[in-house]
Curated annotation (Swiss-Prot):
Name of the protein: Phosphoribosylformylglycinamidine synthase subunit PurL
Family: Belongs to the FGAMS family.
Oligomer status and interactors: Monomer. Part of the FGAM synthase complex composed of 1 PurL, 1 PurQ and 2 PurS subunits.
Gene symbol of the encoding locus: purL
MF terms in GO: ATP binding; magnesium ion binding; phosphoribosylformylglycinamidine synthase activity
Keywords: ATP-binding, Cytoplasm, Ligase, Magnesium, Metal-binding, Nucleotide-binding, Purine biosynthesis
Length: 745
């Protein structure tokens, strides 16, 4: 269907483009006339939440974004952090939530493709990927179909492109029944003096289109990603993009080759809102206008209109400002890789965004008002209600501790994710040192004998719902802790803030308070936010998701031969708890999964204790004093011990007699800033003395050996039984076995 440019602009048409009446009035005021249909589409794309961050920008500015190692913070395609020796790591996390619910395979695949492009647009070769996935209740009729499609899409794209998936999360909760979350992370390596930015420079320079041809897929995708869902959701399927990882691999190689020639003045990938967003961002950042001639855009469908070409989200495309003298060199590279190379416009000095099509000017708009001066809102918000304390003595103990531990390790949310990550290529490129299933993924830095990078992605949405401020702090602290548990120094983070409708003050309040908590934790832990993404309107029929501010972080290991793993325990090692005894059962999985309760406050995050305990752990690991390390998070000490026993295939004999408090709080309390370590017997006294000297709380828990987890006076479980229970839930669920669904309920 061909859409003419002269469609009358009605209030219904404006509303269907996601623009509020007052926003349309502002457009009329800005341009002094009624917009053309193409112009309406451009405003709709650039002024939606997905591109403008209009509800969150005010609060995002409060986050710490600088640090001794930060080369490039937010505002570019990805963040850039120095890792010494002239190397840097380039990384970002981004959501592809709405498309993945509508079309799970392509939605997830193009989410991976988009984040990889963000990284190599900066001049970095991708070396690692992660994904944080949230699905509805296991017994919801759509959940299994969505899990299957999303996991296949993530694997299908990442594996074919050739990047290892080294970590991530998969969780289930009924609050995601109508809106799943697909948060994709990628990191790449570059030289610190060879980073490419998107800010256009110079007047009259060619604007070049690179990559795959433009089709009608994804038209209006950014607008869809900024709206709530309702019953008409199936009609939105055409707004999901289609990805081709082989084309993207060629685009990566062509771009990196091109970047060595000096031809690139500025470069931007085409993601949300396609050609519109990339051209506007490049021009607005450089205080330049952009003129495009759509007759020169490579297309793969006939009779495409200006509206469709400007808003198509076809994948594997880039836009760049070219050094004119290098045109032939640049073109030859793209022809060699079988990709399109077309000069589609030029930079101008008039700050206008002009679009020509078939000899007609179809758009002429002020570029700054579309880009960095788009509307910004200070939406009303209110603080979340505070939950009262929930002392452990008011929470029932399990009748059978053995059954309780087995039930948790074999539950929907605590069971092994092997079924998922075995569909991902975790070893491609040959540098993976730690694979999914531990605290953090670790990848060796190519061409360096000892250096490696650690990656983790974390958030506990039930904590954020209970207390957005503490939950925001906890997401940062757990990510920092997981990186620390390998022995790496946490360098910086990227955030992916997934929330409901910001026009509701209680939802806006969750976002504001979570950002405040994230900011406080990042400052206390020297863990700046260097890139990120906000996904709002994750609601269906007025029901919002759990607030989910995902934090993904990167850490540096100067010598990977000294790193710690969750499964390194040796017979005869001593088991130590670093941190305080467990006390906190509010908002815990023990409470939720065994007692069916979701009450109680989130655990408090003492950032001073996090820093002190984490620095102590890292130092002990780097000094070669630790054989295995695991942070304590969901499920508390009991689940951490079970996971260590399974990972090392060794028994643990644990004595809680020195610990203070009821056994269910000691074993299932989710107090923060805690680790379990195993240490050689001859170093145990030395490490305990060091902890005492550093003011770090610790407990001697027991020893490694045998083939069972023995918690003295509480329970005994064979490691083999733990592992069978842990490994069976996911495959049984995906096979549709009824007892798995019953257990999940």
């Amino acid at each position: 269907m061909t859409i003419p440019n002269s469609i009358p602009i009605t209030p219904e048409l404006v509303a269907s483009h996601g623009l509020k009446p007052e926003e349309y009035d502002r457009i009329l005021q800005l341009i002094g006339r009624e917009p053309t249909f193409t112009e309406l589409g451009i405003f709709s794309a650039m002024w939606n939440e997905h591109c403008s961050y209009k509800s969150s920008k005010r609060w995002l500015r409060t986050l710490p974004t600088t640090g001794a190692r930060v080369i490039q913070g937010p505002g570019e395609n990805a963040g850039v952090v120095d890792i010494d020796d002239g190397d840097c790591v380039v990384f970002k996390m981004e959501s592809h939530n709405h498309p993945s619910y509508i079309e799970p395979y392509q939605g997830a695949a193009t989410g991976v493709g988009g984040i990889l492009r963000d990284v190599f647009t900066m001049g970095a070769r991708p070396i690692a990927a992660m994904n944080a996935l949230r699905f509805g209740a296991p017994d919801h009729p759509k959940t299994r179909h969505l899990v299957s499609g999303v996991v296949a899409g993530v694997g299908g794209y990442g594996n074919a492109f050739g990047v290892p998936t080294v970590g991530g999360e998969v969780e289930f909760d009924e609050r995601y029944n109508g809106n799943i979350l697909v948060n994709a992370f990628a990191a790449g390596l570059a030289k610190s003096d060879a980073i490419f930015l998107s800010e256009a420079k110079g007047v009259g320079l060619p604007v070049v289109y690179l990559g795959a041809k433009t089709g009608r897929d994804g038209v209006g995708g950014a607008t869809m990603a900024s709206a709530e869902f309702d019953e008409s959701i199936e009609e939105k399927r055409p707004t999901v993009q289609v990805g081709d990882p082989f084309t993207e691999k060629c685009l990566l190689e062509a771009c990196l080759e091109l970047m060595k020639t000096g031809a690139v003045i500025a470069i931007q990938d085409m993601g949300a809102a396609g050609l519109t967003c990339s051209a506007v961002e490049m021009g607005a950042k450089g205080d330049l206008g952009i003129e495009l001639d759509l007759d020169t855009v490579p297309v793969r469908e006939e009779n495409m209109t200006a509206y469709e070409m400007m808003l198509s989200e076809s994948q594997e495309r880039m836009l760049m400002v070219l050094e004119p003298s290098k045109e032939e060199v640049a073109k030859a590279i793209f022809v060699k890789w079988g990709l399109d190379f077309a000069i589609v416009g030029k930079t101008t000095d008039d700050l206008r965004f002009r679009i020509l099509h078939q000899g007609e000017e179809v758009a002429n708009l002020p570029i700054k008002d579309l880009g960095d001066q788009a509307p910004e809102y200070d939406r009303p918000w209110r603080e979340s209600d505070k939950r009262g304390p929930l002392p452990a003595n008011l929470v029932d103990e399990p009748a059978d501790y053995r059954a309780a531990i087995l039930s948790l390790v074999g539950s929907a949310n605590q069971s092994s994710r092997r079924w998922v990550y075995e569909q991902y290529d975790t070893l491609i490129q040959g540098n993976s040192l730690q694979l999914p299933g531990g605290d953090a993924g670790v990848v060796r830095v190519e061409n360096h004998p000892t250096k490696a990078l650690a990656f983790s992605s974390d958030v506990t949405p039930r904590y954020v719902e209970a207390d957005p401020f503490e939950g925001g702090k906890q997401a940062v602290a757990e990510c920092w802790r997981n990186i620390t548990a390998t022995g790496a120094e946490p360098l910086a983070a990227t955030d992916n803030l997934n929330f409901g409708n910001p026009e509701k003050p209680e939802i806006m309040g969750q976002l504001v308070e979570a950002i405040k908590g994230i900011g406080e934790a990042c400052r206390a832990l020297d863990f700046p936010i260097v890139s990120g993404n906000v996904s709002l309107y994750n609601e269906t029929n007025g029901v919002a998701i759990l607030p989910t501010p995902t934090i993904a972080g990167v850490g540096l290991l100067p010598d990977w031969s000294r790193m710690a793993k969750i499964g390194g325990a040796q017979d005869g090692d001593h088991v130590l708890l670093i941190g305080t005894d467990g006390t906190h059962l509010g908002s815990s999985i023990y409470l939720r999964d065994l007692l069916g309760r979701t009450d109680g406050p989130a655990p408090e995050v003492d950032l001073h204790a996090e820093r002190r305990n984490g620095d102590f752990i890292r130092s002990a690991i780097r000094n070669g004093q630790v054989t295995a390390c695991h942070d304590i998070s969901s499920g508390g000490l009991g689940i951490a011990l079970a996971e260590m026993a399974m990972a090392s295939a060794k028994g643990l004999t644990i004595d809680l007699s020195e610990s203070r408090g009821p056994a269910h709080a000691l074993l299932f309390g989710e107090d923060q800033a805690r680790y379990v370590v195993t240490v050689p017997a001859d170093l145990a006294n030395f490490i305990c003395a060091n902890a005492e000297g550093a003011g770090v709380p610790f407990r001697r828990l027991g020893k490694v050996g045998g083939d069972a987890l023995v918690i003295d006076g509480v329970c005994t479980i064979a490691v083999e039984e733990l592992r069978n229970t842990h490994e069976s839930w996911f495959p049984n669920f995906m096979d549709g076995k009824a007892e798995t669904l019953a257990a999940a309920q």
